[in-house]
Amino acid sequence: MKHLLGLRDLSKEDIIKILNLAKDMKTILKSETKKTPHLQGYSVVTLFYENSTRTRTSFELAAKFMSANTTSISVQTSSVQKGESLLDTVKTLEALKTDVLIVRHSVSGVPHFIAKNCSFSVINAGDGMNEHPTQALLDMFTIRERLGTIEKLKIAIIGDILHSRVARSNIWGLSKFDNQITVFGPQTLIPPYIENFAKVASSLEEAVSGKDIVIDLRIQLERQKRGFITSKQEYYKFYGLNEDIMKFISDSTLIMHPGPVNRGVEISSEVMQLKNSTIDEQVTNGIAVRMAVLYLCTRKEGIYR
């Protein structure tokens, strides 16, 4: 059985395999029909226990463009509201002949639990504060497309590192390619032991200076159970990407953000519109990357053996 549960245990070779295939899938997206029969006859189900626009829509379009039969389950109107357990939901989907389940959950490890208790493929679309593997893969795809490489780069990740599954997946993925990773954010939002995996900068200016890529993160207020920041205004003043901080950033430095963006909090509208901003590209590339992942997870050789 083949799954994509995270980048921590994914090999460098498998990441390259996904990115290479995503390049081919992007060619299909540029065609007039945007259609391929690779998943014809397959049943792909999305099950999101958390809100999503980009990831859910991107996966659904990816499956449709590959001719899969797609079903989207709304947790709010499903039997979950009647007290159905996660395991029973999984067994129901199994009985309905699901081939691939794309799942997002607020609890870390849920995709791994499902993968151990089902016969279909499982793709992690974000689990708690753990990982968001396809977001990191599309970030890496965008970097490689823009810069020609994902190796030996200087990368800054700015913002709510503590609660960010995007940050974790990017650190796991990018660190496999001999990149120098620096993180910066409010001290309350920097996780313990992060020094084992990345350098912690002492200022925003230090963090972004001389970098090839700056990845800005969303403040995840929905995961914060106490006051990690004093106010959005203060956050923007000290940690936001604006015109003032751009003085320390090269015109060739990629400005990235996984979305959704809080304009005027994490990043200004003006910075988002710069030529070196890749925010819209990341959304487009997400479809190609997810097409590649769906293809590999439904093939015998797959991502995992």
UniProtKB/Swiss-Prot annotation:
One of its GO terms (cellular component) is cytosol. Keywords: Pyrimidine biosynthesis, Transferase. It catalyses: carbamoyl phosphate + L-aspartate = N-carbamoyl-L-aspartate + phosphate + H(+). SUPFAM superfamilies: Aspartate/ornithine carbamoyltransferase. Carbamoyl phosphate binds at R54, T55, R104, H132, Q135, G259, P260. Transmembrane segments: none annotated. InterPro entries: Asp/Orn_carbamoyltranf_P-bd, Asp/Orn_carbamoylTrfase, Asp/Orn_carbamoylTrfase_sf, Asp_carbamoyltransf, Asp_carbamoyltransf_Asp/Orn-bd. Pathway: Pyrimidine metabolism; UMP biosynthesis via de novo pathway; (S)-dihydroorotate from bicarbonate: step 2/3. It holds the Pfam family OTCace_N. The keyword Transferase applies. GO terms for biological process: 'de novo' pyrimidine nucleobase biosynthetic process; 'de novo' UMP biosynthetic process; amino acid metabolic process. Its EC number is 2.1.3.2. L-aspartate binds at K82, R165, R218. One of its GO terms (molecular function) is amino acid binding. PANTHER family: ASPARTATE CARBAMOYLTRANSFERASE, ORNITHINE CARBAMOYLTRANSFERASE, MITOCHONDRIAL. Heterododecamer (2C3:3R2) of six catalytic PyrB chains organized as two trimers (C3), and six regulatory PyrI chains organized as three dimers (R2). Catalyzes the condensation of carbamoyl phosphate and aspartate to form carbamoyl aspartate and inorganic phosphate, the committed step in the de novo pyrimidine nucleotide biosynthesis pathway. Belongs to the aspartate/ornithine carbamoyltransferase superfamily. ATCase family. NCBIfam families: asp_carb_tr, PRK00856.1. This is Aspartate carbamoyltransferase catalytic subunit. It comes from Caldicellulosiruptor saccharolyticus (strain ATCC 43494 / DSM 8903 / Tp8T 6331). The lineage of its organism: Bacteria, Bacillati, Bacillota, Bacillota incertae sedis, Caldicellulosiruptorales. The gene is pyrB.
